[in-house]
Amino acid sequence: TLNVIKDLPYKVYIFCPESEKKDYLKKYKGKYTITRGSDKSLNDANNAVHKYFPTNKKILFMDDDIKSVNKWNGEAFETADLKYYIEEGFRLCNENNFKLFGFYPVKNGFFMKEQKEYSKGLQFCMGGIMGVVNDKELRTTTYKEDYERCIINYIKYGGIIRFNYVKV
């Protein structure tokens, strides 16, 4: 993941279990902000991020195992400009009064080819990478927290943005 984001001009926070914090500090102190996430579950870790940042702060969640971000060009996958999609995602959220954007859940050009560049409304965005405008009231409680996060954002804000040609 750090290779994917190393050239982005944003401040990076690494939320990690207390048991791993010392190793992260040793390796990345001064380059990234290292703070405690949760020792319990991914869901608890994501809720810790929401709690850490102020309301309406723009946050990009990324799991630690992301190796690339790819875009379907109609014929093949190519490297996507992640900075563009982060900025466009937050712009579209602002324009539509939404608080969440994400990416297509499967890397399959066959299914992507009939899609629009992005869609609005209720659709699934996989939790490995998604942008949110922080709402401290929205907490997830289940194992499938990415499904739940999409649904509760749809219920509260009327939809989410999903980029249909982009997959990690």
Features from the language model and the residues they span:
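Short, intrinsically disordered, charge-balanced linker/junction segments flanking boundaries
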Residues: 3, 166-168
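A short, conserved alpha-helix in the catalytic core of glycosyltransferases
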Residues: 142-166
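Short, hydrophobic beta-strand segments that form beta-sheet elements in well-ordered domains
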Residues: 11-18, 101
